[in-house]
Curated annotation (Swiss-Prot):
SUPFAM superfamilies hit by this protein: AbrB/MazE/MraZ-like (SSF89447)
Protein name per UniProt: Transcriptional regulator MraZ
Gene3D superfamilies reported in the protein's UniProt record: Transcriptional regulator MraZ domain
PROSITE patterns with a match to the protein in the record: SPOVT_ABRB
Every SpoVT-AbrB domain range: 5-47, 76-119
Main location: cytoplasm
Keywords: Cytoplasm, DNA-binding, Repeat, Transcription, Transcription regulation
Lineage: Bacteria, Bacillati, Bacillota, Bacilli, Bacillales
Source organism of the structure: Shouchella clausii (strain KSM-K16)
NCBIfam families noted in UniProt: division/cell wall cluster transcriptional repressor MraZ
Amino acid sequence: MFLGEYRHTIDEKGRMIVPAKFREHLGTPFVITRGLDNCLFVYPQSEWDKLESQLKELPFTKKDARAFTRFFFSGASECELDKQGRMNVPQPLREYAKLEKECVVIGVSNRMEVWSKTLWEDYVSQSEDSFADIAENLIDFDL
């Protein structure tokens, strides 16, 4: 399971150190793709396979299904960690997520997300006030 928030940097070649706690869960290979909210989603191969199966079931006759699967799969790239525990973030994905030098890596249960430091701070700032309302609308059990 992926949990926590970590601050990292991306070098000029697009390499980023993956938090040590996440490396074992990621395995090799793993998949990185465009996520929602201008972040990147990083999935272990087993989780990617589950998601791929679900998305393949969407009706291709539906415009939204075609748009989403195109967006999601066209940005996907299979990756491996190097000996230093770094992953290479492809240039188109760095551009999509507005990744420059500083980034934030967060754990979200079955996936890892990579955010621009600025976008993450903005997202947290905007979401903090509405967290209780979101929880009330989505969760049917007491925390």
